[in-house]
Amino acid sequence: MAEDIEIDLDDLERRMKGAMDSLRAEFASLRTGRASASMVEPVQVEAYGQMTPINQVGTVNVPEPRMVTINVWDKGMVGKVEKAIRESGLGINPQTNGTIIMLPIPELNEERRRELTKVAAQYAEHARVAIRNVRRDGMDQIKKGKANGMPEDDQKFWETAVQELTDKSIGNVDQALEAKQAEIMQV
């Protein structure tokens, strides 16, 4: 029975990648000085009696580095989309031209850039904590295996494998954070 004990590294790796994917999504929603279609993804619009993501009521484009446009499909929804953007907390003042809503992205000042780098660091720390929690789950599996008769050599092997996976994932988080902070601070 002791030989049958295995730790599911694939599951641990999948969960760590999930934390990384979540971090990338959070980073994408951070407003840098550059326009991005993902900036408006979290914005919900009341459409046809229910809350709907903006990308389901119109086409989101980035025609210029500092401009996001939303081509609303239903003319009657333009006002609601504009209102949702104003109330979203993005700090962007929409301009309407027929069914097209233009979102000019203002230049960020130095103070705001520093605040955003701190927010990015918080997001990265949340991802690190999630990865460490996955590591802890893996180590708990190893402890259960030890209690069920796992040989000490196997235990050391799995502990090393889980730790290497954790180190690699946290390294990826750190790289993503450095890249995002550089992007935010870029004038």
Curated annotation (Swiss-Prot):
GO biological processes:
cytoplasmic translational termination
Q: Where are the transmembrane segments?
A: none
Which keywords, in A-to-Z order, does the entry hold?
Answer: Cytoplasm, Protein biosynthesis
Q: Does the keyword Cytoplasm apply?
A: yes
Q: Which GO terms describe its molecular function?
A: ribosomal large subunit binding
This protein's major location comes to cytoplasm
Give me the Gene Ontology terms describing cellular component: cytosol
The listed locations are: Cytoplasm
Q: Name one Pfam family in it.
A: RRF
The cross-references to NCBIfam families, in alphabetical order and at most eight, read: frr
Q: Which family does it belong to?
A: Belongs to the RRF family.
Report the protein's function: Responsible for the release of ribosomes from messenger RNA at the termination of protein biosynthesis. May increase the efficiency of translation by recycling ribosomes from one round of translation to another.
This one is known as: Ribosome-recycling factor
Q: Specify the species.
A: Paracoccus zeaxanthinifaciens
